[in-house]
Amino acid sequence: MLARAARGTGALLLKGSVQASARAPRRASSGLPRNTVVLFVPQQEAWVVERMGRFHRILEPGLNILIPVLDRIRYVQSLKEIVINVPEQSAVTLDNVTLQIDGVLYLRIMDPYKASYGVEDPEYAVTQLAQTTMRSELGKLSLDKVFRERESLNASIVDAINQAADCWGIRCLRYEIKDIHVPPRVKESMKMQVEAERRKRATVLESEGTRESAINVAEGKKQAQILASEAEKAEQINQAAGEASAVLAKAKAKAEAIRILAAALTQHNGDAAASLTVAEQYVSAFSKLAKDSNTILLPSNPGDVTSMVAQAMGVYGALTKAPIPEAQDSVSSRSSRDVRSTDASLDEELDRVKLS
């Protein structure tokens, strides 16, 4: 009988502990788990136990045994991350603009003892602290900075909450601003400001585009002129090189002709052949003078071909008086010998010209 009674009592205690753990933890005394001697604490929860009205210990997750009548579960704290909606409130910025702003608060209980005995309602206390801190931080910023520095504002609110909530055993993980509502007039002025800023930006971009276009056109003209001047320079250099090559080639050809002529003059009857050539060229050049309509100078007796030939021979004779030093003796020795034959041949040539 005693064994059956013990088993029945154990079953009742186990059933009571399971029912207590299934209920949601609340601060009201009616919602707290009862002391059934054997208790099972759920994961991520901390049960604060008082013995005879004083703090005794904190029950960890798992199996726990309490003394009936003496021990009492006074608080149940959740160690999970808690999400709290901060109600919408009004705040005044540094430039005297009234805003309606709300947010979301993420916190976690780090010390169940401080959360139980440090403050009456930790969640409500943190919510009120978040609202007051948010109003204080918004008063330090202008309206433009509130929108631009939203992340830094959230970080400042988190730091301020953690400094004040440390004695409550609560840590604020993050704070996020949800909505910021501005007055209608301020909203209209902000729209006008945005439109003006856009027009200004469009004007600046258009002017920059015009400037860049002008710079590109000028740069293109500059490059074109540089390339044209370089091309002209290269053309002049090539033309000069071609002319120099032509002059050099002509000079070489003339020098070769002179060398061949000099070599021919040193041969037998070279003077006679040279005299005949000079006479022919003189007569030919004189006969071409009448073909041009230019003012010319005629000899004193243009009808006398003999005098013309004699004059040409005189010119050649004057040229042959200053021969090359090496060939001077040979030319002078042959000149006396060939004069008669040269004169005779010239006379015959002149007679044929007269008869024709």
Curated annotation (Swiss-Prot):
The modification Phosphotyrosine is found at Y124. It is a peripheral membrane protein; Lipid-anchor. It holds the Pfam family Band_7. Keywords: Acetylation, Cell membrane, Coiled coil, Cytoplasm, Cytoskeleton, Lipid-binding, Lipoprotein, Membrane, Mitochondrion, Mitochondrion inner membrane, Phosphoprotein, Transit peptide. One of its GO terms (molecular function) is cardiolipin binding. The modification Phosphoserine is found at S17, S330. The modification N6-acetyllysine is found at K145, K233. Residues 1-28 form a transit peptide. It is found in: Cell membrane; Mitochondrion; Mitochondrion inner membrane; Mitochondrion intermembrane space. The modification N6-succinyllysine is found at K145. CDD domains: SPFH_paraslipin (cd08829). Residues 215-252 form a coiled coil. Its main location: membrane. One of its GO terms (biological process) is T cell receptor signaling pathway. InterPro entries: Band7/mec-2_domain, Band_7, Band_7/SPFH_dom_sf, STML2-like_C, Stomatin_HflK_fam. Belongs to the band 7/mec-2 family. This is Stomatin-like protein 2, mitochondrial. The gene is STOML2.
